[in-house]
């Protein structure tokens, strides 16, 4: 009897093999590790994929509309993936003659497709009939053994849904991108690689919509009236924003030389319930707000923590913690860490988590497994502690906060101020990532007279809608039903890679904006949220066995064909507009000679650089190292654009000879050091601008400008 277990990643195969037997032997084939053990006359081989081994590819790339596609080995399609061949060869060799197969890839859509394709194409189609499925949410020994001893059938509806998603994304992305690129090439004889996608383009459309709201926004002046009183009290006039200067002047006149009389004091005790457990979206949002991690980075770190067995499966929508995960056991294990123990010991029995409404049939909310980590890097440690403290805090008591709202009369004008103080810290003692409002209450009572030191009148303007950051865009996509928990971060990353968007506070550049404007004018369906949402619903219906994979794909081909026909009818207009936008997007500034500084590509060095549009009359050039972004921010010294580069991201002037790149400090105070409490200031170093502690060299805390701006 020979059994083959197919895992998703090498680390997972090691964990699973060692959990199932003490007699596991590690071997390798073509440098691919695999594990074997024999028990009770059964030989078991544990081998892994390395993520996706197969990818969709056109059967005939010369087709006008690419609808005929098939799965091919990833190494045949992408030269950078040659290493994948060894994994495919290893699975083929080790699975020959096997009597039984176990699909042990991650229990989600992607993991299901990875394992299914490995079985179908590497092991042979007959392997599918001999295969069962392991379902686990952590890579702990207990969960692995339980999943192995209680296998389930492969869910072929989940397989079909996953394959349909891949097919839809491929058909829309490849065809629309091809048609847009061809429209520019056939109109201008220039090659410009343009990209569009089933979810990517509606996402970009949301950002363009916000960009237009900001550009078209007309600020309206207004006035705020405040009273500065004794005991450092600042009270606000009840009118709030006042849009007529005459009204503001009338209030100021009436308050002149008058004291404030306490008219009413309202005290309330407010309960602050513990936070709910993390699902992937809320973890990404919290990590962005606390640490400045991009959603994609958070997802990568969380996946690493899961693979190492320290936390549960991250790609979950659940905010539920079922009893079956073993609260007591996890907390007891965490208590082996002295810092965690203080918080665990303070929890009161019986343990009952404060859960959210969201559920996920496949996995519980993200939680620590209880296995204490070793050798984590700084960012992994940060995210691990965030997950641990969140887990502990959901079992803690409510926090109680007392609020004091005081109404004041200054002559006939009503003002008010509010204060908050903590009565009981509750869960806030266990979750150090929340702001705590704990203010001093003034010793006053109704009827008291307070001295007015000054009546302030602040002139302000209404502000446009805020730009999205990566975390708020993830929330917006989730709210609108676009993408999935697993794909949203990658969609945003693609928009950055395509140079359609830039900055921590996301700004759409000229090419991205013109692309959406052009598509909306000539083929609006491409940008449609409704179309994308419709297919998301149908993909879920495939999983629920309400509709077939083939019917959804055929329906998509009909709709896509209509979109492509619209592009084809307006090819010359679309090509001209997109090429013009592309040319504008390449301009990064103005040269001293009066020409434009534009991004250029060197066929000799196979890299980009900035050069003058007046070449060969003007031969000014600036190097652009790989991984560098040219920003819209201008150098304060020479006026050239700033660039962003390196990890962590640093800033410097485009001109490497500019004096701004020296080591002088700007001394701009940007915050408080979290380690020592001194001021954080902008500094200039060898590699550009960064944030450092003013307490240097005693305190060596630093971070990038981008991390600071993300706050």
Stretches found by the model and what they are:
Residues 2-4, 121, 177, 295-296, ...:
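Basic, low-complexity terminal or inter-domain segments flanking catalytic cores
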Residues 105-107, 285, 315:
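Short glycine-centered, acidic/aromatic-flanked micro-motifs in structured strand/loop junctions
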Residues 76-101, 206-207, 286-287, 385-392, ...:
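Phosphate-interacting basic helix/loop segments used at nucleotide- and nucleic-acid interfaces
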Residues 307-312, 321:
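Extended, well-folded interaction surfaces typified by the phenylalanyl-tRNA synthetase beta subunit core
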Residues 10-13, 17, 43, 81-88, ...:
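Amphipathic alpha-helical transducer elements in NTP-driven molecular machines
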Residues 1-174:
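Intrinsically disordered, low-complexity regulatory segments
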Residues 41-45, 51-82, 191-303, 307, ...:
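Long, highly charged, low-complexity internal segments
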Residues 141-223, 227, 268:
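C-terminal or mid-to-C-terminal helical accessory/interaction module adjacent to the motor/catalytic core
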């Amino acid at each position: 009897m020979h059994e083959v277990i197919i895992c998703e990643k090498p680390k997972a195969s090691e964990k699973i093999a060692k959990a199932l037997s003490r007699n596991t032997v590690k071997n390798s084939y073509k440098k691919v590790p695999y594990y074997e053990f024999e028990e009770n006359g059964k030989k078991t081989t544990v081998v892994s994929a390395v993520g996706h081994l197969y990818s969709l590819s056109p059967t005939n790339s010369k087709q006008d509309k690419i609808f005929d596609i098939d799965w091919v080995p990833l190494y045949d399609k992408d030269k950078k993936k040659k290493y994948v061949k060894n994994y495919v060869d290893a699975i083929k060799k080790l699975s020959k003659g096997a009597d039984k197969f176990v699909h042990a890839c991650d229990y989600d859509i992607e993991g299901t497709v990875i394992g299914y394709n490995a079985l179908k194409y590497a092991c042979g189609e007959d392997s599918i009939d001999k295969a069962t499925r392991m379902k686990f949410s952590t890579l702990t020994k207990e969960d692995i053994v339980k999943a192995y001893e209680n296998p389930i059938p492969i869910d072929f509806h989940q397989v079909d849904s996953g394959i349909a998603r891949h097919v839809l994304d491929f058909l829309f992305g490849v065809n629309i991108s091809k048609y847009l690129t061809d429209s520019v090439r056939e109109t201008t004889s220039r090659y410009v690689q343009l990209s569009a996608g089933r979810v990517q383009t509606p996402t970009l459309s949301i950002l363009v919509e916000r960009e237009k709201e900001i550009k078209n926004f007309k600020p309206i002046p207004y006035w705020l009236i405040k009273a500065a009183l004794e005991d450092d009290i600042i009270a606000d006039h009840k009118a709030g924003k006042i849009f007529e200067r005459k009204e503001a002047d009338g209030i100021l006149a009436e308050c002149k030389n008058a004291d404030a009389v306490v008219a009413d004091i309202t005290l309330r005790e407010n309960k602050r319930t513990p936070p709910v457990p993390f699902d992937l979206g809320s973890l990404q949002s919290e990590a962005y707000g606390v640490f400045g991690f991009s959603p994609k980075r958070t997802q990568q770190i969380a996946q690493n923590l899961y693979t190492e067995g320290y936390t549960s499966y991250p790609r979950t929508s659940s905010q539920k913690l079922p009893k079956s995960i073993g609260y007591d056991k996890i907390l007891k294990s965490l208590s082996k860490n002295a810092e965690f123990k203080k918080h665990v010991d303070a929890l009161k029995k019986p343990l009952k988590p404060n859960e959210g409404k969201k559920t996920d049939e496949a996995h519980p909310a993200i939680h620590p497994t209880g296995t204490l980590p070793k050798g984590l890097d700084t960012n992994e440690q940060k995210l691990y502690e965030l997950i641990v403290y969140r887990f502990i805090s959901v079992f803690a008591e409510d926090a109680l906060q007392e609020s004091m709202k005081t109404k004041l009369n200054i002559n006939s004008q009503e003002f008010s101020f509010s204060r908050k103080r903590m009565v009981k810290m509750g869960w806030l003692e266990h979750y150090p990532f929340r702001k705590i409002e704990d203010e001093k209450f003034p010793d006053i009572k109704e009827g008291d007279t307070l001295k007015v030191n000054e009546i302030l009148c602040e002139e302000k303007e209404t502000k446009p809608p805020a730009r999205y950051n990566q975390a708020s865009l993830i929330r917006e996509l989730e709210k609108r039903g676009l993408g999935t928990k697993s794909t949203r971060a990658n969609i945003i990353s693609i928009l950055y890679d395509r140079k359609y968007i830039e900055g921590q506070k996301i700004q759409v550049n000229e090419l991205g904006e013109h692309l959406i404007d052009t598509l909306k004018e000539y083929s609006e369906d491409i940008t449609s949220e409704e179309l994308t949402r419709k297919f998301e619903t149908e993909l879920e219906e495939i999983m629920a066995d309400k509709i077939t994979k083939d019917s959804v794909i055929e329906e998509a081909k009909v709709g896509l064909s209509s979109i492509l026909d619209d592009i084809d009818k307006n090819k010359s207009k679309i090509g001209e507009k997109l090429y013009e936008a592309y040319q504008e997007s390449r301009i990064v500034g103005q040269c001293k000679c009066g020409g434009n500084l534009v991004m250029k590509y060197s066929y000799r060095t196979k890299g980009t650089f900035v050069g003058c549009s007046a070449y060969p009359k003007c031969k000014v050039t600036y190097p652009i190292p790989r991984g560098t972004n040219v920003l819209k921010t201008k150098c304060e010294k020479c006026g050239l654009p700033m660039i962003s580069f390196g990890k962590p991201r640093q800033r410097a002037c485009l001109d490497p000879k500019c004096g701004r790149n020296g080591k002088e400090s700007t001394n701009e105070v940007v915050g408080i050091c979290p380690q020592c409490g001194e001021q954080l200031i902008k500094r200039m170093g060898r590699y550009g601008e960064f944030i450092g502690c003013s307490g240097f060299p005693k305190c060596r805390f630093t971070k990038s400008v981008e991390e600071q701006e993300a706050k």
